[in-house]
Design a protein with these regions (language model features):
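Residue(s) in the substrate-gating loop at a strand-loop-helix junction
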Residues: 145
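Short C-terminal tail/terminal secondary-structure segment
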Residues: 150, 228, 239-253
Length: 253
């Protein structure tokens, strides 16, 4: 995949888990990687130092803050003079089952989840698209979830936010196609990351793995491969596609 050589790739929430695997994959194929992080400075800097190649950078950002998304895109353009690929990966998951939560906590869960998982990515899309429209090319890939379609009874705001990502992405795919801008979605099921490790222990872990007929969960590297696949120029006609990666644990008709 030499076509990624010297391409400028932004990965939000890129310091760990799926974002880390995506950063490693793009760097391996010669891209210049920019990752943003909210709190994990040490992890982000360690990752940047370990990536093959050069010109990779990381910086702190919280795109739920007003003006932050524009700052992120402007900073990248100022440094590199371009922005070729955007991966909206940053997200959050917080339990808030309606049967057990107080209303004030319910409201906080909804507002924080939607701000992080939907509004933040929408703002990044807006400012990235403005640049990409000016140069008539670019790719935006948003990370969604199986929960957008299957439902999340313990975290309904999470499911709603990811359903919003799907709808937004397909709307933008139509709006931006005349500008030669690709917009796609990768929607993983349960993925084995450091954050998810505690959920994969014992009987709970067995039950999660058994959701898939493959009797396992996904690997971050598998998600990264799907992102790379959508990012190549030969996939332009797949704009608007939502790629499910969940080991057949949930199949849409």
């Amino acid at each position: 995949m030499h076509e990624f050589k010297k391409k400028i790739v932004l990965i939000t929430g890129g310091s760990r888990g799926i974002g880390k695997a995506i950063a490693q994959a793009f760097a391996l194929h010669g891209a210049y990687v920019v990752i943003t992080y909210k709190k994990q400075k040490d992890q982000a800097e360690e990752l940047i130092a370990s990536l093959p190649g050069r010109n990779h950078i990381c910086f702190q950002s919280d795109v739920t803050i007003d003006g932050e998304a524009e700052f992120v895109i402007t900073k990248i353009i100022d440094k590199f003079g371009a922005l070729d690929i955007v991966i909206n990966n940053a997200g959050m998951y917080v339990n808030h089952p309606i049967s057990k939560i107080a209303f004030n906590d319910w409201k906080v869960a909804w507002s924080s989840t939607l701000e992080t998982n939907l509004i933040g990515p929408a703002n990044i899309c807006y400012h990235a698209a403005k640049h990409m429209m000016s140069v008539k090319q670019g790719k935006i890939i948003n990370i969604s979830s199986r929960g957008a379609n299957r439902g999340e009874p313990d975290a309904p705001a999470y499911g709603a936010s990811k359903a919003g990502i799907n709808a937004m992405s397909q709307s933008l795919a139509i709006a931006l196609a005349p500008y030669n801008i690709f917009v796609g979605v990768v929607a993983p099921g349960f993925v084995e990351t450091d954050m998810a490790a505690s959920s994969l222990i014992g009987e709970q872990g067995k039950a999660i793995r058994n959701q898939s007929p493959m009797q396992r969960v996904g690997k971050p590297e598998e998600i990264a491969k799907a992102v790379l696949m959508l990012s190549i120029d030969g996939m332009d006609y797949a704009t608007g596609a939502i790629i499910d990666l969940n080991g057949a644990s949930y199949l849409r008709s």
